[in-house]
């Protein structure tokens, strides 16, 4: 390779990571993971005899795959590595929500928007603590990313772009999703990846666990150390390494270290989200930032499958009480951030939904896919508590009985007067006054984490001093700072 070609490839490596920022944040859970045999046609064994690549990308998920494709199209030889037997990472279970201003589809629908407005909204949602440089890269590349996804065959729902109710609304309709959620993105991305593997531009290693970043005496990252699924160790050298390894929601050790309060939250991310890449980056000298900032969504059933349904799609008939027996939020609040902030202030991220007989009879239980029979099954299991009186329910729940009685009495009075003086809930359809009464325990669920590797505007990993670690980049969920305090 000539000196000029080498310089061009280094420039291409720096350019390729921008797409990874835009692809790095997707939404809520859905369908199950892809089977390992779906990728047998492109799976490659580790071959130490051919260890050289221009670029190693660790993590074949929603940031790593687009980065690999982009790099290959720029003439970079790519080694894409993942410890799973499948590709896609969280795309296999996520809702696949992506956002962008001024996409072709948005313009065709006559929706007025701009990257500047997107930036302004994202800063507001992040409580103005976002890394502004990273955020600008993301919003300025977002429309091109969405257009590219459409070009390669991603199908978006007829409603896209739309206002997403699962988080605070943007000022314009700019959220997109596919009919098969995250898998709607993964299918076409897999096809594009296979094309470049077949051309010899990308080498894919699955079931390959990266154990260490290799560095020379100056600290420059020069490659990775890998163990295959048989335990065989190999080193792979490269001009640069991009970490797209995702977050650490599945690591009990890291959660207890950085934010013990959320350690009991239900893990809904895949087991691979164990923070491996972050730990390796830290060992190589990179600073980790925002590590205490997890996104712990309220609504998971503590001890059982299922999740609460929220306004505006569902308005619960019961009330929510904390472990002190008190209401703590307007259960019908349209803004999910209002509910989440109130939830995050609760002890151990836990609370209870209180219902009565009428909610069961009317199938107004408020838990996705739960009917009367499922409620009865969970009572039998001991997860849901049932009693003929509120006083008896409080005793079974193990919370202050007198306070629970007072809370329910106050709520029932609000139904009669039509005024919720405490939280201004508007829909006061029915009192909680007909036994048996039920208590469903609710906890948080962790899908993504916002802490990770500190990076500069080129997504180069940096030390706490701000010094760049040559040869090391991070993108997607592994790179921290873009989201600020956004939930």
What is each PLM-predicted segment?
Residues 236-307:
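Glycine-rich loop(s) and the adjacent beta-strand/alpha-helix scaffold that form part
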Residues 5, 28-62, 72-74:
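C-terminal segment of N-terminal export signals and the immediately downstream linker at the start
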Residues 2-20:
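N-terminal secretory signal peptides and thylakoid transit peptides that target proteins
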Residues 140-232, 251-254, 301, 415-434:
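Conserved redox-cofactor binding core of oxidoreductases
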Residues 51-53, 231-240:
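Core beta-strand elements of the Rossmann-like FAD/NAD(P) dinucleotide-binding domain
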Residues 278-280, 286-397:
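An anion/pyrophosphate-binding glycine-rich loop and adjacent beta-alpha core
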């Amino acid at each position: 390779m000539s000196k000029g070609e080498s310089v061009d490839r280094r420039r291409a490596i720096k350019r390729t990571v921008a797409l990874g920022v835009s692809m790095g944040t997707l939404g809520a859970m859905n369908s199950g993971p892809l089977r390992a045999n779906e990728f047998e046609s492109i799976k490659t064994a580790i071959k130490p005899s051919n260890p050289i690549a221009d670029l190693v990308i660790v993590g074949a998920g929603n940031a790593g795959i687009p980065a690999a494709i982009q790099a290959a199209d720029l003439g970079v030889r790519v080694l894409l590595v993942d410890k799973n037997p499948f590709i896609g990472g969280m795309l296999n279970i996520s809702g696949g929500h992506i956002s962008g201003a001024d996409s072709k589809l948005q313009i065709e629908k006559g929706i007025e928007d701009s990257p500047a407005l997107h930036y302004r909204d994202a800063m507001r949602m992040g409580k103005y603590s976002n890394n502004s440089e990273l955020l600008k890269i993301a919003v300025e590349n977002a429309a091109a990313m969405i257009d590219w996804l459409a070009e390669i065959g991603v199908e978006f729902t007829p409603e896209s772009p739309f206002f997403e109710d699962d988080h605070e609304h943007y000022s314009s309709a700019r959220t997109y999703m596919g009919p098969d959620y995250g898998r709607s993105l993964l299918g076409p991305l897999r096809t594009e990846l296979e094309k470049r593997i077949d051309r010899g531009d990308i080498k894919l290693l699955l079931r390959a666990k990266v154990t260490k970043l290799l560095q020379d005496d100056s600290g420059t990252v020069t490659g990775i150390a890998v163990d295959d699924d048989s335990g065989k160790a190999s080193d792979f050298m490269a001009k640069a390494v991009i970490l797209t390894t995702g977050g650490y929601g599945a690591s009990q050790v890291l959660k207890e270290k950085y934010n013990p309060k959320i350690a009991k939250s239900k893990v809904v991310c895949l087991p691979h989200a164990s923070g491996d890449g972050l730990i390796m980056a830290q060992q190589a000298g990179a600073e980790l930032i925002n590590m205490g900032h997890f996104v712990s969504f309220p609504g998971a059933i503590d001890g059982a499958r299922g999740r609460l349904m929220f306004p505006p799609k569902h308005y619960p008939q019961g009330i929510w009480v904390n472990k002190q027996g008190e209401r703590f939020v307007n259960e019908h609040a349209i803004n999910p951030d209002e509910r989440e902030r109130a939830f995050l202030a609760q002890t151990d991220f836990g609370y209870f939904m209180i219902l009565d007989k009428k909610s069961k009879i009317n199938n107004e239980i408020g838990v996705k896919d739960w009917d009367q029979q499922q409620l009865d099954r969970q009572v039998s299991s001991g997860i849901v508590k049932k009693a003929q009186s509120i006083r008896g329910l409080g005793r079974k729940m193990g919370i202050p009985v007198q306070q629970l009685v007072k809370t329910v009495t106050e709520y029932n009075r609000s139904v009669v007067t039509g005024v919720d003086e405490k939280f201004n809930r508007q829909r006061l359809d029915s009192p909680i006054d007909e036994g048996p009464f039920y208590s469903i325990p609710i906890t948080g669920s962790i899908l993504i984490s916002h802490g990770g590797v500190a990076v500069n505007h080129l997504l180069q990993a940096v030390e706490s001093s701000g010094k760049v670690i040559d040869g090391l980049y991070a993108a997607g969920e592994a790179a921290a700072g873009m989201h600020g305090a956004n939930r």
